[in-house]
């Protein structure tokens, strides 16, 4: 299996997973034009689309792609049924695409019906987890998003986080505003800044490394707890997550 990315809009990535025969699955195609261009250039044969949630920048290209490739199966949660999904999927479902088994996780928070697709090592997590951050809570609660992130955090160390936006630099700047002396975050900031100066992507990221630099995965970390305690005493990791998310919303 080979992982490919197609830039879209201002900061989206449309992921394309291909096998040795050139058959492919397209993840969250927010627009069709760059996908069609890549398909023509690489002579890919689209077999399926994975949708993580219903937002337009993740589903906007589905109907046009289906006009070109009507044989494709479009998998998505119930909230994408009117966005082009042909096969509805949910928590605990397994599907076989490109000869590989993918497991579905419900990850509510960003939207109520958000799902992730996992076939080791690839995790297509849409707008749930970003490098250094997590999605805004447009529909779900902090508790829901926290539990969703803990599902992801329980995956194997070598999991490749294939999220949908290039938000890494801004997220790491936020992390440094909370833990300015953290050695892992500072090292990652230098690396990410260098990549972005060269207009190179920072994704995908390995979960093992993400646990070190993403504050939203470190709500039981003593350094973070001590920093939060300077402002407010929060006993539960879910409450610390909510505090962080609130801070990020206004950063």
From Swiss-Prot:
One of its GO terms (biological process) is methylglyoxal catabolic process to D-lactate via S-lactoyl-glutathione. Binds 2 metal ions per subunit; upon overexpression in E.coli the enzyme purifies with various amounts of iron, zinc and manganese. The endogenous metal is unknown. Disulfide bonds: none annotated. It catalyses: an S-(2-hydroxyacyl)glutathione + H2O = a 2-hydroxy carboxylate + glutathione + H(+). Its cofactor is Fe(2+); Zn(2+); Mn(2+). Keywords: Hydrolase, Metal-binding, Zinc. A divalent metal cation 2 binds at residues 57-58, 127, 165. It holds the Pfam family Lactamase_B. Signal peptide: none annotated. Belongs to the metallo-beta-lactamase superfamily. Glyoxalase II family. This is Hydroxyacylglutathione hydrolase. It comes from Salmonella typhimurium (strain LT2 / SGSC1412 / ATCC 700720).
